[in-house]
Amino acid sequence: MTDLSTLRLSYTHGELRRADLNADPAQQFQSWLDAALRSGLREPYAMSLATADREGRPSVRTVLLRGIQDGGLTFFTNYESHKGHDLTDNPQAEVLFFWAEHERQVRAYGPVERLSSEDSAAYFHSRPRESQLAAHASDPQSAPVSNRAELETRLTALHERFAADQEVPCPEFWGGYRIQVQEWEFWQGRPNRMHDRFRYRRNDAGWHIDRLMP
């Protein structure tokens, strides 16, 4: 087995100074995300979403960021999934983006609210038809399924149920969430673990920025 304790990299890609930061953290995030997109990183809009149930048991998974609205981060999922139940019982979450090639990381935390059914349906109908059918087939998400064949059978039945020219309805159990971000952290890797870290915290005046110990 590889001795992981010997594996390390020196981060030399860049630096992050207070003077470089946008006063609006959502704009700062957008600039970093745009840089990741321009450089051709694979799915730089993928984020690790951490939630916790009513007992405080945490869970984490990867979801796709689907928009930035009024400084909030939006994503879509099955409301009956594990994360959906977590967010019903404990409507707060933290997400993390890590762009290894840029030696950058962003964390964002805040309370979570559901999007309107109209906004959820609009996004649902923008998705490929096969993805729309798959959302129906995989309900309830995270529930045990006996085998792959059962899942494929359900998808086949949905193809028969909805003709090719028939609109697939957005399920009531599926839709979007918005994280109303109250705290952001931007991390830039630096040599010898002397990283640059800045935290934005919302206050009555807007946003307060602190440099953090690495």
Curated annotation (Swiss-Prot):
Binding residues annotated for substrate, in chain numbering: 8-11, 66, 123, 127, 131, 193-195
UniProt cross-references to InterPro entries, sorted A to Z: Pyridox_Oxase, Pyridox_Oxase_CS, Pyridox_Oxase_N, Pyridoxamine_oxidase_dimer_C, Split_barrel_FMN-bd
Record EC number: 1.4.3.5
Cofactor(s) in the UniProt record: FMN
Gene Ontology biological process terms, A to Z: pyridoxine biosynthetic process
SUPFAM superfamilies in the record: FMN-binding split barrel
EC class (word): oxidoreductase
Binding of FMN, residues: 61-66, 76-77, 83, 105, 141-142, 187, 197
Keyword terms of this UniProt record: Flavoprotein, FMN, Oxidoreductase, Pyridoxine biosynthesis
Highest taxon above the source species: Bacteria
Pathway assigned to this chain's UniProt record: Cofactor metabolism; pyridoxal 5'-phosphate salvage; pyridoxal 5'-phosphate from pyridoxamine 5'-phosphate: step 1/1; Cofactor metabolism; pyridoxal 5'-phosphate salvage; pyridoxal 5'-phosphate from pyridoxine 5'-phosphate: step 1/1
Catalytic activity: pyridoxamine 5'-phosphate + O2 + H2O = pyridoxal 5'-phosphate + H2O2 + NH4(+); pyridoxine 5'-phosphate + O2 = pyridoxal 5'-phosphate + H2O2
Record region (Disordered): 126-146
Gene Ontology molecular function, alphabetical: FMN binding; pyridoxamine phosphate oxidase activity
One Pfam family matching this protein: PNP_phzG_C
Cofactor annotation comment: Binds 1 FMN per subunit.
HAMAP family, A to Z: PdxH
Family in the record: Belongs to the pyridoxamine 5'-phosphate oxidase family.
Subunit structure: Homodimer.
Function: Catalyzes the oxidation of either pyridoxine 5'-phosphate (PNP) or pyridoxamine 5'-phosphate (PMP) into pyridoxal 5'-phosphate (PLP).
Listed name of the protein: Pyridoxine/pyridoxamine 5'-phosphate oxidase
Organism in which the protein naturally occurs: Deinococcus deserti (strain DSM 17065 / CIP 109153 / LMG 22923 / VCD115)
Species classification: Bacteria, Thermotogati, Deinococcota, Deinococci, Deinococcales
